Amino acid sequence: DSRNIQSLTNNIIWNIFSDQEHNIWLGTDYGISLSRYNSALQFVPISQITGTGDGNQFYSLFRDSKGMYWFGGTNGLLRFIHPTGNRHEAVWYRMGDKAHPLSHNRIRHIYEDKERQLWIATDGSINRYDYTTQEFVHYNIIDSTGTYNTNWAYYIFEDDSGNLWIATCLGGIFVVDKHKLMQSKVGQYVAEYNYSIHNGLSGMFINQIMPDKEGNVWVLLYLSLIHI
């Protein structure tokens, strides 16, 4: 309700996360809603952060260990230092941008691994952020047969052995040695393992994967939930 300052910017909520100050962030079709700790919701227009009139529908919101905010959606990835202050230092990573290119504009998941490396899952495979160059490194990953790949990557996490698990749509689940992947040259990287309908999965549309304390990996598929 536009008459109520405590209402949401839009009823379609794609992502919610809590930052270190206990503020609640909501990514919506019309921008960002911020619920400050013990305060009312605050509407933050994207233009206030970027200084442009371009929009984005946010699917994944994240604040990394260095204090940077990362908001990804249907129109690329925003990086900025503070959404409501006077200094934003916003950078917009998008396909075709000469200064800040990205493999795909659709961002599904933003993840920081155990060594504080930042990864994103996109509809153009996965990318790792290089804090030195401030650019993203793109990785193409395939299974050992060349049948499946990590295009349409939906989710990422790192296990206790240093392997990245990558959930995809139509490609199954990929398990890769993170350090070998980072040391690989440009081109296709063959995953250490791939889960598909041929070896345990009930489907190939994987929305999310999550490890538990017992070492199981829970897999959220379209209309079903399994663990491996």
Where are the language model's segments positioned?
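Carboxylate-rich, polar loop motifs that coordinate divalent cations or form catalytic acidic clusters
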Residues: 1-228
